[in-house]
Amino acid sequence: MYKRQGQYFLTTHPDYNVAVVSPYYLPEATVTALQEQLAAYGEDCNGDGKVVVKINQYTMAFNSEDSDAYLDMAGTTKLSTDIQSSLSSIFILYDPAGFQQTTGTLRYLDGHLPKSDADSDWWNMVYRWTDCPVLTGMELGSYTSDAVQSASGDSQQLLADYYIGIRGAWLKESASLLENSEPLWANLTAGAVSTAGEGH
């Protein structure tokens, strides 16, 4: 807590950081609902009496000629900082193949770390959003047009095209930072059977 001009501001430190990487920002209503719903499956890791999940959004379209180069560059820079500092451990991805090929960040679903030439094996590192009963069962409501989204619709339908994965820890420093996220990952993927490899 710090004081500023006679007012007190309570700074909230999230227990978990979850990254969303996609060509466009998710609607604000979807992000807010997602943060609240994800928190129900986490623990109070920092002991402040509440469970807080922060969604970090990074916009980039891998291997797309139609994408906004400036947005992509800004998103790439922010994502690189996130990965290097082990900020986010769980990733919600629109294009897991492009993400893994670019970052080499994800681990296998069975917990093993992939070798450096295993990026094309990405489908063994993610679940489809729709593979996970816990995720599809979340009450995420609907979104209306806002600053980032011109359309309106159902948040679950929007996320049905996404995948979810967890990053690997190759260094001791990142391993300790990621340790808190293991129970959350286990809770979110409970009962999931991956269909990401179908068609490969």
Show which residues each predicted segment covers.
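Solvent-exposed loop/turn segments at secondary-structure junctions
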Residues: Y24-P27, P96-Q100, W170-L171
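Surface-exposed amphipathic alpha-helical segments
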Residues: S176-E198
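Short, polar/charged alpha-helical segment
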Residues: E28-V52
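A structural signal for short loop-to-beta-strand junctions that line the ligand-binding cleft
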Residues: L106-A175
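Extracytoplasmic "Venus flytrap"/periplasmic binding protein-like
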Residues: M73-P133
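Short, small-residue-biased leader/transition segments that mark boundaries at the very start
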Residues: M1-Y2
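Acidic, glycine-anchored loop motifs typical of Ca2+
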Residues: C45-F62, D68-A69
